[in-house]
Amino acid sequence: MLTLPFDESVVMPESQMCRKFSRECEDQKQIKKPESFSKQIVLRGKSIKRAPGEETEKEEEEEDREEEDENGLPRRRGLRKKKTTKLRLERVKFRRQEANARERNRMHGLNDALDNLRKVVPCYSKTQKLSKIETLRLAKNYIWALSEILRIGKRPDLLTFVQNLCKGLSQPTTNLVAGCLQLNARSFLMGQGGEAAHHTRSPYSTFYPPYHSPELTTPPGHGTLDNSKSMKPYNYCSAYESFYESTSPECASPQFEGPLSPPPINYNGIFSLKQEETLDYGKNYNYGMHYCAVPPRGPLGQGAMFRLPTDSHFPYDLHLRSQSLTMQDELNAVFHN
């Protein structure tokens, strides 16, 4: 029996043919791939309609992406800084001009509306112009005040109306509103929470209540003092009058009837009213100025004298002294009769 050695060329001749055919097919596919890809791009470009501005931008992006490196390798895809061309610069400049024109027209319309609002709001001045925020705040307060009038159905007090009108406004704007309504700005002082403190003698405000001191009344058991010579409660506004030699614009100071007018007081600070000590004080006068309301144990005689501890009776370190001999004589005559 003859035996033949195993030979691949003889036994498997078809395998080599299959290998050659498969290699040829792969080469043909590699050649056909770029052609089909280019055809697809052309077909898509024909089927899709693009705007002229978008076409230029997308074409530039595709060109940038399709560019190759120096080594022939494709570059990485992604956003990169675009090349500055004349068309692109003109396009950017035109867009910027349109945006500026829109903003300018918007600001002109806003300023015109604010000017019309300033004419309606109760605040007019030829020299001073309200700011935008102050105009809006005043308009809001004005609308709210008018709505309150309609809700209540009654005519409000002028001072209350102005206080509601000036809530949250600055001091210059408050002065303008008060001047427009012919009202003194000192008559209302706006607080932090919108509350006002009244310090005026106008018909729209309330007066200060007088300071009643029980120590200044007539001592019990001494009813010989005439009612015409009795002293009224002391008001601290007299310190303002004695210092400035004029009547205080903020409050009314009561006066003592008859010869018992309050002696002048020296003003040495905002919260302290002290007398000026002199070397001759006590030498020219036999009797002191300070009297108390405590009744003595014995009968009231000519030699009796009352001394008043002023620190316990008058707050803010207030002391009174006489500056004229006639005033001292009249006071002594009243208290020793």
Swiss-Prot record:
Q: Where is the composition biased (Acidic residues)?
A: 54-71
Q: Which GO terms describe its biological process?
A: axon development; dentate gyrus development; positive regulation of transcription by RNA polymerase II; sensory organ development
Q: Where is this motif: Nuclear localization signal?
A: 80-86
Q: Which residues cross the membrane?
A: none
Specify the signal sequence span. none
Q: Which UniProt keywords apply?
A: Activator, Developmental protein, Differentiation, DNA-binding, Neurogenesis, Nucleus, Transcription, Transcription regulation
Q: What GO terms are given for molecular function?
A: DNA-binding transcription activator activity, RNA polymerase II-specific; DNA-binding transcription factor activity, RNA polymerase II-specific; E-box binding; protein dimerization activity
- PROSITE patterns found in the cross-reference section: BHLH
Task: Report the Pfam families cross-referenced here.
Answer: HLH (PF00010), Neuro_bHLH (PF12533)
Annotated region described as Disordered, given as residue ranges:
43-82
Q: Does the keyword Transport apply?
A: no
Record-annotated bHLH domain positions: 94-146
Instruction: State where the protein is found.
Output: Nucleus
Main localization (coarse): nucleus
A GO cellular component annotation in the UniProt record: nucleus
Q: Does the keyword Ligase apply?
A: no
InterPro entries per the UniProt record, alphabetical: bHLH_dom, bHLH_transcription_factors, HLH_DNA-bd_sf, NeuroD_DUF, TF_bHLH_NeuroD
Q: What does this protein do?
A: Activates E box-dependent transcription in collaboration with TCF3/E47. May be a trans-acting factor involved in the development and maintenance of the mammalian nervous system. Transactivates the promoter of its own gene.
Give the multimer and partner information.
Efficient DNA binding requires dimerization with another bHLH protein.
Q: Which PANTHER family match?
A: BASIC HELIX-LOOP-HELIX PROTEIN NEUROGENIN-RELATED, NEUROGENIC DIFFERENTIATION FACTOR 6
Protein name as catalogued: Neurogenic differentiation factor 6
- Organism (species): Homo sapiens
